[in-house]
Amino acid sequence: MDVEAIGRVVEQANDAGTELIRFLYVDHGGVVRGKATSRSTLERRMASGIGLTVAMQAMNMLDELQPVDGMGPVGEVRIVPDPDSYVNLPFSPGAAAMMSDLIDLDGQPWAACPRSFLRSAMAEAARDGLVLQAAYEPEFLLARRETGPDGDRLVPVDESLCFSTTGFALAHDFAIDFVRAIAAQGMAVELYHPELGHGQQEMSIRHGPALAAADRQVWYRETARGVAWRHGLWASLAPKPLPDQAGNGAHCHFSAWTATSDSDPGGRGDPPRPETHNAFYDAGDRYGLSPLAYHFIGGVL
């Protein structure tokens, strides 16, 4: 890893008085996992990564190890952080985090690393002169967790109607803290409204290159839960947390843009400059779609 990048992260951690820095990754079940290093060992751990048993990528969402060849309790990879993804966590004072790649002991991206797979897909698109843009449209339930004779249950913070001002008012304190926490991590909430389900929230983050968009979705999920807990609440992004209410969507919007010399196929910059071209658009087509767009849709289907 670049020595200058490591030094920049160490300086950020020192300036913020950060005590623990989380090296995070996402497993095949969508669970955000990781390990943390202290500030005193941050420089060394960034260079070496942190060891992780290969079995973790065979765990299901209940931490039950599944029988997958090559993913047993013997063998490890390294959790290697991306220094460009460093953020201080406003909902966990004294902590910071970085998104990480899973690297094998030969220093190569591990085949079972989702983030490395996305990097590879973006590089393949870049070879065809394309930059992939993406954004998520996540929804989540904001609720109180109550314990009763039949076990824990989630009770929504409101029973308001979709888009109603009552919903805005009842979730106001949480919403403001969420927006500020997102901004503190270098992102911005573009739209917000109470959704169809009781207690259901929708806050949308601006699109960006695919890798950045995926990382932002992780920060979004972590922030929703972290801010909720500090309010004594529970934020659930599960597809159907309440059987009698609308489920939570997590729509992923994506498009392809022609790359220019100052585009950012590496994945961490702003959206394409105005002079780049939306490769999915064709003004002469009945539906405004280019041949590439039709082929892309066909590939997805």
Residue ranges and their predicted role:
Residues V155-T166, H198-A213, L242-G247, N278:
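Active-site-proximal beta-alpha loop/turn segments in soluble metabolic enzymes
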Residues D150, V189-S204:
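A short mid-domain helix/strand-loop element embedded in enzyme catalytic domains
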Residues V3, E190-G197, A210-A213:
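Metal-centered catalytic cores of metalloenzymes
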Residues M98-D104, Q201-H207, F254:
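Short, hydrophobic beta-strand segments
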Residues V26, P138-A143, E195-Q200, K240-G249:
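A glycine-rich phosphate-binding loop feature that marks nucleotide/adenosyl-phosphate handling sites
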